[in-house]
Amino acid sequence: MIRETGEFVINLTTEELAFATDYCGVKSGRDVDKFKETGLTREKAEKVKAPMIAEAPVSIECKVKEIRELGSHHMFIAQVAAVHADEKYMDEKNRFDLNRARPIVYSHGEYLGTGKKLGTFGYSVKKAKKQAKKR
């Protein structure tokens, strides 16, 4: 489908959407209406014809620039046409809050939560604070 249209949308998925995400990855849209079966809401994209998922915290509209055949699958190299982020996942500094969104990753057949904050940029090279001398 992406090869024919040259467009797609990446919808960030979350712990809450994991079951629907798995269903959409297993079932073909040629056989079932994935939106109807999962209860997800189809949302019109601004720059591409592929739909966005309204429940996704982030949707990235993409236009294919190159397709590389890699044996059993294809890799799509695309240009980002638009990015949409749900306001409820933005913090007070207008940054996307991963802890609030609780995104998941897929690795080797398993869905995993992203877990806790491990550090901030530069924490590996920061000098330890000196303790005040006791009197």
Can you annotate each of these PLM segments?
Residues 1-135:
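Basic, polyanion-binding surface patches
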